[in-house]
Amino acid sequence: MASKRWCFTLNYKTAVERESFISLFSRDELNYFVCGDETAPTTNQKHLQGYVSLKKMIRLGGLKKKFGYRAHWEIAKGDDFQNRDYCTKETLISEIGAPVKKGSNQRKIMDLYLQDPEEMQLKDPDTALRCNAKRLRIEYCSSFAVISLRPWQSELHRVLMAEPDDRTIIWVYGSDGGEGKSTFAKELIKYGWFYTAGGKTQDILYMYAQDPERNIAFDVPRCSSEMMNYQAMEMLKNRVFASTKYRPVDLCVRKKVHLIVFANVSPDPTKISEDRIVIINC
C-alpha cells in the first residue's frame, strides 16, 4: 500500500550511523520530517523514532530502496502534531519543515512562496519575510557537522542529561573568547532550543512565548556583558511570567527546562542568588 505519511524506527550504534541515515531525507521531497532519539529501557538499545510526510505517494518497497533495509516502516496514524509529540517524547534530534493541522492552508502559503518568492514579496512583504525566515531556519537546522567536544562541552553535555528543575541556571564562563561557547549555543538551535543574545526583558519574553516549552540558551556577546538581563533569566526559569508586548499573555508553564548562559564574565552575586548557579569553566 502506498502512502505519503510514514513513521519509522531505526536501531543504531554510533552518531555517524544516525546522522548518515537522517541525511538521506531531502527537503525538496518532503512536507515535514521529525525524528527523536530514544533508548530502550530493558536493552539500552539506542534508536531513532521518526515521522515523515512526503510530497508524493510511495510504497514500502520504495522506502526500503531509498533509505535502506534496516529501518522498520509503518504507515503513520494521527496528524503531524501527534506524531511530533510521539517522536520527541525523549529527545528531538532533527526537524525539517513545520507540522500542519489537517485542513490548514499554512503549507500552501509556504509552497506559494517557494514557487515564486519575488511575486509574494511584491504582493505580501510581511508574509514573504516570515516565509523566508522559516526557509533559512529549516536549512540551518537540517545541516549537521561532526564536532569533537572540548572537555567543558562534554561536562555540559553530562549536566544536560539530567532532568531540569525550576531553579538551576547553568553558567558557561570563559573570559578569553574562542572557547567554542557560541558554536555550542548555536548548535542547540537544531535541537529545538530557544536562542537569544539577550536584550530587553519584554522582547525576550515575547519571542519565547511563541513556544514556551523550549530549553533556553543565552549567548551573551562580550559587549553586552555589563547589561546582563538577570531578570529575564529568572522569569523564564521560574516558568511563570507575563509577555505584554503586542499580544499580552500570562504564561504558567508546568514543563521544566534547562537554561544556559554562555558568557565572557562570571555571574554577579549581587544580582542573582549564588545557589541558583552551576558554573562550567571553559
From Swiss-Prot:
Lineage: superkingdom: Viruses
Motif (RCR-1): 7-10
GO cellular component, one term: host cell nucleus
Location in the cell: Host nucleus
InterPro entries: CRESS_DNA_REP (IPR049912), Helicase_SF3_ssDNA/RNA_vir (IPR000605)
One Pfam family, short name: RNA_helicase
EC numbers: 2.7.7.-, 3.1.21.-, 3.6.1.-
One GO process term, biological-process aspect: DNA replication
Chief location category: host cell
Motif (Nuclear localization signal): 56-77
Domain called CRESS-DNA virus Rep endonuclease: residue spans: 1-99
Motif RCR-3 per UniProt: ranges: 86-89
Notes on the domains: There are 3 rolling circle replication (RCR) motifs. RCR-2 is probably involved in metal coordination. RCR-3 is required for phosphodiester bond cleavage for initiation of RCR.
Subunit structure: Homooligomer (Potential). Rep binds to repeated DNA motifs (iterons).
Additional information: The genome of nanoviruses is composed of six to eight segments. In addition, some isolates contain subviral DNAs.
Record family assignment: Belongs to the nanoviridea/circoviridae replication-associated protein family.
Protein name: Para-Rep C1
The organism of origin for this protein: Faba bean necrotic yellows C11 alphasatellite (FBNYC11A)
Lineage of producing organism: Viruses, Viruses incertae sedis, Alphasatellitidae, Nanoalphasatellitinae
Primary gene name: C1
